[in-house]
Amino acid sequence: MALRRLGAALLLLPLLAAVEETLMDSTTATAELGWMVHPPSGWEEVSGYDENMNTIRTYQVCNVFESSQNNWLRTKFIRRRGAHRIHVEMKFSVRDCSSIPSVPGSCKETFNLYYYEADFDSATKTFPNWMENPWVKVDTIAADESFSQVDLGGRVMKINTEVRSFGPVSRSGFYLAFQDYGGCMSLIAVRVFYRKCPRIIQNGAIFQETLSGAESTSLVAARGSCIANAEEVDVPIKLYCNGDGEWLVPIGRCMCKAGFEAVENGTVCRGCPSGTFKANQGDEACTHCPINSRTTSEGATNCVCRNGYYRADLDPLDMPCTTIPSAPQAVISSVNETSLMLEWTPPRDSGGREDLVYNIICKSCGSGRGACTRCGDNVQYAPRQLGLTEPRIYISDLLAHTQYTFEIQAVNGVTDQSPFSPQFASVNITTNQAAPSAVSIMHQVSRTVDSITLSWSQPDQPNGVILDYELQYYEKELSEYNATAIKSPTNTVTVQGLKAGAIYVFQVRARTVAGYGRYSGKMYFQTMTEAEYQTSIQEKLPLIIGSSAAGLVFLIAVVVIAIVCNRRGFERADSEYTDKLQHYTSGHMTPGMKIYIDPFTYEDPNEAVREFAKEIDISCVKIEQVIGAGEFGEVCSGHLKLPGKREIFVAIKTLKSGYTEKQRRDFLSEASIMGQFDHPNVIHLEGVVTKSTPVMIITEFMENGSLDSFLRQNDGQFTVIQLVGMLRGIAAGMKYLADMNYVHRDLAARNILVNSNLVCKVSDFGLSRFLEDDTSDPTYTSALGGKIPIRWTAPEAIQYRKFTSASDVWSYGIVMWEVMSYGERPYWDMTNQDVINAIEQDYRLPPPMDCPSALHQLMLDCWQKDRNHRPKFGQIVNTLDKMIRNPNSLKAMAPLSSGINLPLLDRTIPDYTSFNTVDEWLEAIKMGQYKESFANAGFTSFDVVSQMMMEDILRVGVTLAGHQKKILNSIQVMRAQMNQIQSVEGQPLARRPRATGRTKRCQPRDVTKKTCNSNDGKKKGMGKKKTDPGRGREIQGIFFKEDSHKESNDCSCGG
């Protein structure tokens, strides 16, 4: 503390004496001063002597024997010359009243000092008035020493010197006035001046003369300018000039910039001598160049590598220059039908670096002797084609009976700097077993005023099984960039929503496992005009009437059979039809609403990039360090400095070298998607770099990375309100995306990024569809020809690939669970198939540890099997807002239960709205034996029953574990149904028991076996407890429901 006070005191010590600028000095006058006096009998100008016996002009007054003296002396007009505070130095002598014989009591030994401001010399004999107002009094001046008769006789001079100041002054000038009211004195000298801080060199900066402030306590900030070859650091460099013209409080400093070192006590910045360099600004001295580098001139900021040696972009400047590696050695190939295993040994010379990796270049040489060409996009590489760290690779999906040449390149961090191609070893192989050819012709099957039905034949060379077709169309009068694309699993499609009488251009292409073939040639078809349509109706009217009579009986029979056989099957079929209808009508939105446009609908994807993403010049981007690796290349952090804007921290995704055109297109598609979004909870695209290498996507930088790993690193560190705030941000971002008609498909905590302010932003747009078939990553599982993250995906999306905003809501519920469990893996160590089975059997995840009931209820609402019953993202945002505004709603936690454990919730419960009384509801769920118990305990209405918890069920007298489970699950579903009627309001549902970890669960078991004793309710045959290696907590497996009609076999996990 003492050192801190000392430092503060040193900051306030003046650095250099003030400079005084004189405005008026009476001692320099060579003639009469000519000041105005009032009355004439008062002050008198006389010649006198100063303390050095120099002749000077003075004023004196001594009317002490006359009463009521009021003698004024006024100077001439004094211009202030920009000064804000004026100082007056007065030298005077005063006669001691007591030394004057017979002096009356009115004798004074003081006088008053006044000033008056004016814009010009306007004073007269009578103006300003000789009184205190309008004059402004500065002070009453008293003598420190006065002289007596003895002093006078001995010619002893006792001169007093007093300095007074006043301000602020703002007009062009001023007058001074001295008022005597009964003294005997002599005004020997008057000097009027102002002060300013002098020019000074301090902390490597030059500060020019600065006028002091208007008040004695004023501190006027002055900006310094750095000495030659120095730059400011930390904060703008400042000194403060006080009211007395003294420099105080130095802030900031200048340091020699890169390439210069400080000499002569820091007053000069000298360029680094030849053979030395200095990379950064600072006080440190220049250092010698590292190995294999040199400088060519003084003032070097880095040393240039010698010929044949290079420095990578991210290498520190003090690191020795290195070279490229030699070729790999001893390549071994093993062919198996259309797949290949390659192995090799590292090169002899790594170039002096430790970042050696390998790239695989595939060339297809066909069956003839023509030149080889790069392989197509259908070839698969495991683990990847570029940037291999191990000397082996597995290559699959090659063409049958085709000759290939594979080049194994050895590259390191300076390969891109070298003008020479990477060194490589090559191997030639021939496979033992491609995209389909173009569709040759398309036919019009039928048309109406707003639709056309088309069909086409299979490609002449399908080269495998046709998975589906993609049809693109646009109005002939419009540009091809306005094309709309739709997919069809068959070679027939009906295009709806067209204009009457308009001509449309159609093209189609087929897709196999090898990818899409080429589009067919452009074909033109026209919809009917209104007149043509009316004519066709009249021609078909007799046929329609005749057919209707014959078909009516058949239709009635079909309807009756359909209703009787399976009402639920009808509902499912209706839902699927609705899905198809939605697929064709989803593009019709409210006029004026911004709609997401799929970049893959553009024939030239580069056009989508140009339309939605801003091109950034590579010179504006500075890559600093690699922070990760993605599917297409490295992810780096760096800075972006656009002209006219401040420098910002950004994340940079780079496209690895050796990419194919398809990889480049897929890589930039994410930018085309992100560029359409502008929301605080959606990752912001700054722009792209496509006109230089490497190709880059530049986004805002999120300091805390992905949400799942961030939560795991900060387990238990946040309040519930903070976690709800994160969830609210994610929901707001998803609401924005849903309003734009964008379906994410891969919403998970790993795809949410977190910045330093804990703001969560949705990211990862479009890349999941391009994941390689890597069996080592169980997150994405093949399903119906695509990759699906099973644990986060809604059941209809898994089974039918029906991705909608409602399926994103299901995924959002999983994200909620991830957040509240601090990044636990959903469904723990269950297999993906076990997860699918459990969801189909209507079980759901339990609440994580310390999860409020209201939040788990919202999760359950998101996991409604019927997607139409799930809340919209707008409702979710409103619900979370209400929780944040009312924190008390988050205090109710799901309690632990010693008698029952229901980790996965049964959702197959009848709709309570179909019953009139609680008794009917109990009968419907086969719990009628408790009707009297419910009535006696006061649970006689659905509103009261919906609020029951486990302790209420126990108090009613339900002791059997299976019955507790049945009633509790039914109450939970009742709450969900109530929320669907009253809109989702985040009301608490079931409070779920938990184990010692974030959640509690039981081992899977064969539902056909009896695994517990019906007499004591204790579970037998359970697996041992497992320890989650990623979390270090004891957790138990998953509990699946048993046959609901076997009440005696309902079991629970141990407590």
Curated annotation (Swiss-Prot):
Q: Which residues are glycosylated?
A: 265, 336, 428, 482
- Annotated signal sequence is 1-18
The record's listing under Gene3D superfamilies reads: ephrin a2 ectodomain, Galactose-binding domain-like, Immunoglobulins, Phosphorylase Kinase, domain 1, Transcription Factor, Ets-1, Transferase(Phosphotransferase) domain 1, Tumor Necrosis Factor Receptor, subunit A, domain 2
- Protein kinase domain: residues covered: 621-884
Q: Which cysteines are joined by disulfide bonds?
A: 62-184, 97-107
Q: Indicate, by first and last residue, each region the UniProt record lists as having compositional bias (Basic residues).
A: 991-1002
Q: In this protein, which residues make up the domain named Fibronectin type-III?
A: 324-434, 435-530
Bilayer-spanning residue ranges: 544-564
Tissue/organ expression: Brain, heart, lung, kidney, placenta, pancreas, liver and skeletal muscle. Preferentially expressed in fetal brain.
Q: What is the effect of changing residue 787 to R?
A: No loss of ubiquitination by RNF186
Effect ascribed to mutating residue 891 to R: Complete loss of ubiquitination by RNF186
- Motif: PDZ-binding (in isoform 2); annotated at 984-986
Membrane topology recorded in Swiss-Prot or TrEMBL: Single-pass type I membrane protein
Q: Where is this site: Cleavage?
A: 535-536, 561-562
UniProt disease annotation: Prostate cancer: A malignancy originating in tissues of the prostate. Most prostate cancers are adenocarcinomas that develop in the acini of the prostatic ducts. Other rare histopathologic types of prostate cancer that occur in approximately 5% of patients include small cell carcinoma, mucinous carcinoma, prostatic ductal carcinoma, transitional cell carcinoma, squamous cell carcinoma, basal cell carcinoma, adenoid cystic carcinoma (basaloid), signet-ring cell carcinoma and neuroendocrine carcinoma. Bleeding disorder, platelet-type, 22: An autosomal recessive disorder characterized by increased bleeding tendency due to platelet dysfunction. Clinical features include epistaxis, hematomas, bleeding after minor injuries, and menorrhagia.
Name of this chain's protein: Ephrin type-B receptor 2
